[in-house]
Amino acid sequence: MEVAAVSATSRPLSPLLSTAPARRLRLLPPRCVFGRRLRASPRTRASVEPATQELGTAGAGEWSGDAIRRRFLEFYAARGHKILPSSSLVPDDPTVLLTIAGMLQFKPIFLGKEPRRVPCATTSQKCIRTNDIENVGRTARHQTFFEMLGNFSFGDYFKKEATAWAWELATKEYGLPAERLWISVFEDDNEAFDIWHNEVGVPKERIKRMGAEDNFWTSGATGPCGPCSEIYYDFYPERGSSDADLGDDSRFIEFYNLVFMQYNKKDDGSLEPLKQKNIDTGMGLERMARILQKVPNNYETDLIFPIIEKAASMAMVSYAKTDDATKTNLKIIGDHMRAVVYLVSDGVIPSNIGRGYVVRRLIRRVVRMGRLIGIRGDGHGNSEGAFLPSLAEVVISLSTEIDPDVESRRRSILGELQREELRFVQTLERGEKLLDELLDGAVLSAGNNGDKPSLSGKDLFLLYDTYGFPVEITAEIASERGVTVDIEGFDIEMENQRKQSQAAHNVVKLSVGNETEIIKSIPDTVFLGYDSLSASAVVRGLLVNGNPVNEVSEGSEVEILLDRTPFYAESGGQVGDNGFLYVNGGEDRSQAAVIEINDVQKSLGNIFVHKGTIKQGSVEVGKEVDACVDAKLRQGAKAHHTATHLLQSALKSVVGSETSQAGSLVAFDRLRFDFNFHRPVSEGELTRIELLVNQWISNAAHLETKVMALQDAKNAGAIAMFGEKYGEQVRVVEVPGVSLELCGGTHVSNTAEIRGFKIISEQGIASGIRRIEAVAGDAFIDYVCARDNYMRRLCSSLKVKAEDVNGRVETILEELRATRNEVSSLRSKIAVLKAASLASKATTVEPQNVRIVVENMGDVDADGLKSAAEYLIGTLQDPAAVILGSSPGDGKVSLVAAFSPAVVKMGLQAGKFVGGIAKLCGGGGGGKPNFAQAGGRKPENLPDALEKARAEIVAGVSSSS
């Protein structure tokens, strides 16, 4: 529903009844700066909710969660606010991992980095918060997934209107008794206090002044900030108003927070009034549902309880009659299932890093809680099945008004959850067994030493890295057994692992990321590159190492800001254009200053930053330049970008429509396409995909591009990238009958320009994510020609025709295998011959008369060493023990231990024995009690290792008497 914007001064304020309230839900950690946790006030400590608490009769009645959400949005739409959709849980903000508040999508507007598109807006925003995960299910109000209802003003209305409307919404729309509402205000915000008391009519005794830690919002050390005011609901007004503590969770719940952004905090800490005053509010939908539905906690609202009921039925327990511990586990399941469904729907795939780790941790927590309450298999009799999909079905059925796109992604969501659950169950039992052993060992060790039982960081890392146990789950289980965990030691182990792979994840930021004043003062760049590869432009700014300068001379690297440009700036996976800027010096371009452009990036929304080197002359701010894009490279990017669209359509056609894009790279000479899929794409499927793409190329279809409303594009079936930020008007690129995508990139005008398409590789890059690399256009021709040359040379070397290469290679490989087998057999015979001379040198150890051979056999390989040991153990009479070592070359060490049955009965085991010796040689190994092999990388240590082996076996045999 769209409502025309009305100025704040023209809006009539509704009559206000006397009584109290106002504040935003503390769904962020206490006092947050865009998700950065600040020190918590003592009053925010969560109280544990008794599982048997009853505050009212459950049931949504008139006030279903959907009705509460709808009423909020319609209330503000009627007051001039534009209803905007929830943004993705994957934010377009590198400073936060997940969307944690309703204001996050408007952060650039609040910080003055982007112009406002509407004067005021209202949203219901999906949010994820995991910092208080240990309180989920144990208190009445903590959740990982929640919806934040919000109304926002971007310089339109301010404190008076925001306060009046919040009160009207709470008391008139939702019908909350005014006498049950309390207000908190910033201690120095007399204006807000006066509005609440004198205009709204809240009694002074129900307005509490709070300190800056609780009621003053900041965006960082400097920048926009302001006081906030919060509305609380009082569950027990009969307790009176004297000495009432709004931090008492058993009595009060904060459900609405109003942030008044009216100051700019300067470097010296002083506050100056903002020219544009903003409003940022947030109401917790689940909290309001708890109040209106008269249930004892957020979990028993109609937003979550259907999931709990489903889990209870699968566990064959009654929620109403079960014990408190089971209720807590059911609440955790209900909460976490909402989080994982919406995260997976927004394209977050379980993994061991970043957002993927968040969803994996939540999934595995649900699986563990399900097992604790008795759910086995799929919960419907199939012990080999998964139960998460059944719970996810309930979440999806509740999602219609939260996120309409979830239903269309049902198949991929259910498939991903099933795979992740079964994957975890496969390792869970092994991991649980090891964890039990580690916990038993910790308790036993502590008992012997008188210390408190604890698991080391190495133990935690082993469970995490090998068995997939999130450290938080290990800590939970350990806590249940009274065992502490060494989180600091675990962090050290994790850091060591990160250092090994850090290079692969480094991100290089442009120096303009410092957001210098020059960038902020320059208007958006006009992009001309869809229609032209050259244009005249004016230099609006120059940056060297991020600092503004007026002139740059030959040899310097520079970042150039133009008023308009034909250069495409990197976005949507497509790399930025290359080319040249010529400082206008008349008709003779040879006399002009020349800047070679090797990259173009966007800054602060839509300012194009041209990165390059001054090759000749100098350039000054204000000068006119001729901007010329490298046409050949641009054509390569266009061919690969259109080919990427065709590839995505072919993938969906061949392997299933549930595949979705997870990322892409469109370069001048190649393309890379990452997609969500649970298995490798077969050779046959890859061939079919190639054929489809090349067929569409040969159809010579003309592409169509148009700009339309975002919702119209979605209704037409246009594919949108998960997490991508789109405006109200979007550019749609269509290959008729084949592909329809939202895309701002450059494309060929006709598919025939692509010339051809070839897949180079297909591989997995993370759990549930596959990658295809391919070439198109001139790169395709180059690739085919290179492969043809390779084939010619191969045919010449093998002296066969191309069609006979495969057969000839197989013959050569078979001959090679036979030759290697012959060589190995000969080496084994030689080793046995050497061993024959060793049998007579065996040492006899009393009192068991054990025959022992410990010998260095030179360069004998591992197979020969094994044959020699088998020969000796068969030749020597039982009891006998043989330990052989060798250095076969390439810095390798081979070790073998063979013990006869009588020696094994003495308690000596070859597997354990050889592993310990191998460590001296920089390796390891093991095997059975009677026979084991090992290896190493330090041949220089072999003599000492064998001497130690001799001493230990003699000692072991001697002591066995």
Swiss-Prot record:
Obligatory cofactor(s): Zn(2+)
Q: Give the cofactor note text.
A: Binds 1 zinc ion per subunit.
Q: Please state the Enzyme Commission number of this protein.
A: 6.1.1.7
Q: Which GO terms describe its biological process?
A: alanyl-tRNA aminoacylation
* Intrachain S-S bonds: none
- Catalysed reaction, written as an equation: tRNA(Ala) + L-alanine + ATP = L-alanyl-tRNA(Ala) + AMP + diphosphate
Compartment(s) = Plastid, Chloroplast; Mitochondrion
Sorted alphabetically, the keyword list is: Aminoacyl-tRNA synthetase, ATP-binding, Chloroplast, Ligase, Metal-binding, Mitochondrion, Nucleotide-binding, Plastid, Protein biosynthesis, RNA-binding, Transit peptide, tRNA-binding, Zinc
Entry-linked SMART domains? tRNA_SAD (SM00863)
According to the UniProt entry, its GO molecular function terms are: alanine-tRNA ligase activity; aminoacyl-tRNA deacylase activity; ATP binding; tRNA binding; zinc ion binding
Q: How does it assemble?
A: Monomer.
Return the similarity comment. Belongs to the class-II aminoacyl-tRNA synthetase family.
Could you tell me what this protein is called?
Alanine--tRNA ligase, chloroplastic/mitochondrial
